[in-house]
Amino acid sequence: MANFTFGDLALDVARMGGLASTPSGLRSTGLTTPGLSPTGLVTSDFNDSYGLTGQFINGSHSSRSRDNASANDTSATNMTDDRYWSLTVYSHEHLVLTSVILGLFVLCCIIGNCFVIAAVMLERSLHNVANYLILSLAVADLMVAVLVMPLSVVSEISKVWFLHSEVCDMWISVDVLCCTASILHLVAIAMDRYWAVTSIDYIRRRSARRILLMIMVVWIVALFISIPPLFGWRDPNNDPDKTGTCIISQDKGYTIFSTVGAFYLPMLVMMIIYIRIWLVARSRIRKDKFQMTKARLKTEETTLVASPKTEYSVVSDCNGCNSPDSTTEKKKRRAPFKSYGCSPRPERKKNRAKKLPENANGVNSNSSSSERLKQIQIETAEAFANGCAEEASIAMLERQCNNGKKISSNDTPYSRTREKLELKRERKAARTLAIITGAFLICWLPFFIIALIGPFVDPEGIPPFARSFVLWLGYFNSLLNPIIYTIFSPEFRSAFQKILFGKYRRGHR
């Protein structure tokens, strides 16, 4: 503040550095600190998030009057103009470690989002309207890292807001603006993906104008949520010049408005959209699988006839499916087809498959079914011994037994591979959506729970460490976004590799 003395600031710095934690330590620095009573030294941690005054020893309090009032003036009438100071005395190692960790965090966030922006601008394959949303998201997260996080680091280390209240108001508004814009961009991306999945014509109709309109709406809504405290919608008791802390407005009405608009409503929309995307993707994958199976069955019917008047049969023996007391039943399946000019040997009118060996349970094994399939293919091929190019192939044999069981020998390597691929696609879609929604909820849900209940509960019930942790956990989402929304794209991965190895040169893109 403008009325700080050098001794005041030196005292704060000394306490932060662990140089002076007792009155004797202060005297050893040779600094005089007007307005500080030795018996009124603060001993408790500073409640950095909500401006709580510390506890005082010997029953007296220390104060710095903004109008340079006398140090002996401790009357209650001046307490509203006093600024209470209470700094947690950390060791030098603790401060250095905290500074390094948070500094690296901010640096990684800046680098990650700069990579995304550079990739979209430099890589030709990424020059499409769908990536405009990714680009705008990276800009919002970069603003969080550049404009918001550095002051958060300073506040986290010092535990005191040293700047003017006007700077605090602007910083809080920018914080809410950028974080809200980042969250709303995730909703816009989810909507774009949902329309692309459910609407056949959306990809064709998705123009730059449409995407830019979505981006504009995102920033306007974020601005609408962030600026009300600048126009008076705030808690009048939350003055940084009095409390020594800079926090978002604790007005109950604004708290509900901002948390619902910035998180809870977007979260609900995202959850609904991604659940529907997953259902549509799963339905489409299974539908494609069914259509492929149906088409394959049509082309792989058991058909062994060389001319319209000549028929061949495949006999399927069901002895193995019945219990030992059951009667043996044989069923024949006939399916005529044309011979394409071939004449089979008259003596091969009927082709009978040999009975399959049975396992201990009386049911034929899969390996036996495969052997039987090969045997029938050989026999039917021999039926065209006059040199016909068409080779009959039996790819599907079913045995319907008395007990209602159906055994299929359609266990070819091709079908197994296709089933594995379809299952892999479905699992990948579910995993991708789970990562996106899970990261969003893990990062932001704890912060907004505390932010919503904060004005309605006793502030002492929420530890300052918990407030700091959930705040930086929310900031962590700005570091994860450039990873989550690009790592699944081969184009982005290729662009990142080119950037890392300096393959982008002037005139070569």
Curated annotation (Swiss-Prot):
Q: Which residues lie on this side of the membrane: Extracellular?
A: 1-99, 155-169, 234-259, 457-465
What SMART domains does the record point to? Answer: 7TM_GPCR_Srsx
Task: Give the chief site where it resides.
Answer: membrane
Is Transcription regulation among the key words of this record? Answer: no
PROSITE patterns, sorted: G_PROTEIN_RECEP_F1_1, G_PROTEIN_RECEP_F1_2
Q: Name one GO cellular component term.
A: plasma membrane
Q: How does it sit in the membrane?
A: Multi-pass membrane protein
Q: Which family does it belong to?
A: Belongs to the G-protein coupled receptor 1 family.
Protein name per its UniProtKB record: 5-hydroxytryptamine receptor
Q: Which organism is it from?
A: Lymnaea stagnalis (Great pond snail)
